[in-house]
Amino acid sequence: MAIKIKVAHVIRVFSYGGAEVLLREFFAQPEFKAQIISDVFVLDHKKLGLKDDVTPNINKFYYYKITTWRFLFEYIKFLRDIKKGNYDVVHMHLPVAGWMGVVAKLFTSKKTKYIYSEHNLVNFYSKYNYYLSGWTYGFFDSVIYVSHEVGEVIRKVQKGWFFKTHHPVTILNGIDTNKFHCTHRYELKPAETLTIGLVARFRPQKRVERWAEVAAEVHKKKPNIKFLMVGDGPSDDLLRQRIKELNIEGVIELPGMLTDTYTAYKRIDIFLLTSDFEGLPLALLEAMSCGCVPVISNVGGIKQLDFGGIGYKFDDFNPSEIADKIVAYTQNPDQYFIESDRSRDFVIKYYSLTKQVNEIIDLYRELMK
């Protein structure tokens, strides 16, 4: 039997963003638990929403107060904890965790390998994240791209040491298709109503104010259609202000962030995403696995999703045209059911979580040789 690998997973927040939720799913997978001893390091103590979810499946959970006046003390404590852990692998997820975490390489054994997962298109990062990431990439022993588009952008911005990568690999995001499976679709009556939904962290790139604009157009054309936006985040106030300006207060249900996203997907029939950029959105794959039909902006890693005949990808944001595509499903229910089935089949075929987990474990073992 192979020796278990001891891994420190480092991330800035541990709430309900795609990368965080994906980690939660990793830790619950039998293959991962059988081969990996996982410790979690969260740099911002204010956002620990998934802590209780992962505790049964990991070894230790650490968190720090880097957003307080104690920043320097907390950062030193973090570096000491990484050193004491004597890890085989330190796996960092998203910026901040990447450029703060890799400093620990100065204090740990050469046998410890440092891996960074890039979940987004770096050219859309804030200036400080962009430059700090670019200057520290060369210290990682391997960089994982979660989509082909993510890797293409990195290659375009590389210049000398800037975004220099060692052992880059593309490992596509995957989901647990057994967990995200809804069997109630054929009970729907699309001719009467559908529910348009979103499950996301309301970050600026999600452009949730545009989501509200589409909802307003759909509501004018088909008042019976319902709307559900599950999430919270920095753009929450912007969203609510736009809803008020559009005079659709009370039209969109806003329950905040839910721990059980599967329950949300069961209620959603059409998954609407109006982002400016994406790596490979986990929530989209989860929604499609549940049979939700995607209506999404054709940006970033979404471009690589070759699912002709399923939903609608838009290159230009035109709320009225997008609304027409959505309303058309109420006029042709049979087409909705066909595309719902195709959505799930597509994810099962190409984006299995088991495949992703095994590829990451293989990478760990390869680097340890």
Where are these regions (language model features)?
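A short, active-site helix/loop in glycosyltransferases that binds the activated sugar's phosphate group
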Residues: 140-170, 175, 179
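Short His-centered aromatic/hydrophobic patch
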Residues: 92-99, 118
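N-terminal strand-loop element at the rim of the active site
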Residues: 9-73, 162-164
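Conserved acidic donor-binding segment of nucleotide-sugar-dependent glycosyltransferases
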Residues: 308, 312-319, 328-333
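Acidic anion/phosphate-binding donor-loop and adjacent secondary structure
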Residues: 127, 155, 172-192
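A conserved mid-protein helix/loop that constitutes part of the nucleotide-sugar donor-binding site
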Residues: 17-25, 194, 198-220, 227, ...
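Short hydrophobic beta-strand element within catalytic cores of glycosyltransferases
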Residues: 41, 293-296
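Aromatic "clamp/platform" in nucleotide-sugar-dependent glycosyltransferases that forms part
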Residues: 257, 276
